[in-house]
């Protein structure tokens, strides 16, 4: 499930759900009580639209951390809440990757996801599969 930061901050915690919290600068105020929370920071820009050095794209390392986190919590949770500021593109990209990696439902007609974030996660997932061989 992907949503915006405001909704994630106001959502009551669910003890058998995990959270991926994506912000630009400051941490989101996620309530205590979730199974686990992974925090990461990167801007909502795609590689082709990154015009300034200060714009922080998602890195391969951040993608690997998210992939490894999802695999670590997956056996212990019944749901995953992914949020970013607007709840439109970064969180959607993560949710799309999770749905594909774990054969879960996702509206694949939804095309507003951040393509750079999605590519980074797909590549990190492939690297993980190679490490496990």
Describe the residue ranges of each PLM region.
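Glycine-rich, flexible N-terminal cofactor/catalytic loop recognition
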Residues: 1-40
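Catalytic cysteine-centered active loop of the rhodanese-like fold, especially the PTP/DSP P-loop
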Residues: 73-102
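Adenosine ribonucleotide-centric catalytic and binding domains
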Residues: 34-46, 106, 117-121
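Short glycine/proline-enriched coil/turn segments at helix->beta-strand junctions
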Residues: 14-16, 33-36, 75-78, 100-104
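Helix-loop module immediately N-terminal to the HCX5R catalytic loop
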Residues: 38, 43-80
């Amino acid at each position: 499930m992907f949503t915006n930061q405001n909704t994630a901050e106001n959502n009551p915690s669910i003890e058998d759900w995990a959270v991926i919290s994506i912000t630009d600068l400051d941490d989101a105020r996620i309530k205590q009580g979730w199974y686990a929370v992974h925090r990461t920071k990167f801007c909502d820009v795609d590689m082709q639209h990154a015009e300034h050095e200060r714009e922080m794209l998602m890195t391969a390392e951040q993608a690997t951390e998210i992939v490894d986190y999802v695999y670590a919590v997956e056996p212990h949770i019944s749901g995953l809440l992914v949020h970013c500021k607007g709840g439109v593109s970064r969180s959607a990209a993560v949710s799309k990757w999770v749905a594909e990696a774990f054969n879960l439902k996702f509206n694949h007609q939804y095309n507003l996801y951040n393509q750079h974030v999605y590519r980074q996660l797909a590549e990190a997932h492939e690297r993980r599969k190679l490490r496990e061989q």
